[in-house]
Amino acid sequence: LEDNLARIGKVKPETILPPIHGLPWGYRQRARLSVRHVLKKGKTLVGFREKRGSYVADMSRCEILPPKISGLIPLLAQMIDGLSIREHLPQIEVACGDNVDVLVLRVMEPPTAGDEAALRAFADAHGIQFWLQPKGLDSIYPFHPLDAPALTYTLPEFAVEMPFAPTEFTQVNSALNRVMVHRAIRLLDPQPGERIADFFCGLGN
């Protein structure tokens, strides 16, 4: 970065702040998992796509996801394997808030009554909320449970609570986001009556 500032911008920073750090594991609140039923393996896989390929990695966990979501990967694969639409469910969008975890299922075909019953049972058993996406991003809707709390992330230091939809952009690392906001506010040193808004990171802070 310093080289680029000097070479491109012809400037040299007066002060370089120390980098901020977060937990190395279990930090990612957002993810997109691929789903594929593999006949040769005789099962359905839920995971990330392999590098430079269209194959879905055979995963039993993901250490950068919250432990609860990581632990659900094999259970999701097993549940989806029993659905009639298992070959028409290509991806799962993960969105974790401070008070609810949402999984958005991309469903290319409508689920049957049996599929819906299986999804409800899974959501109830594991304390998550399913949303369904039959078409484009504007087609998503909450499926079960309908009385789940809204997705939000909070900045307790500033008494800020931000609601968001599962497909809206938020920082994937909420803990590090709080640290960044704290540092920014400290550097800006707002005075009484002044307001600060962050218009860069999606919904802002």
Q: Across the structure, where does each feature detected by a protein language model lie?
A:
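Accessory RNA-recognition modules of RNA-modification enzymes
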Residues: 1-205
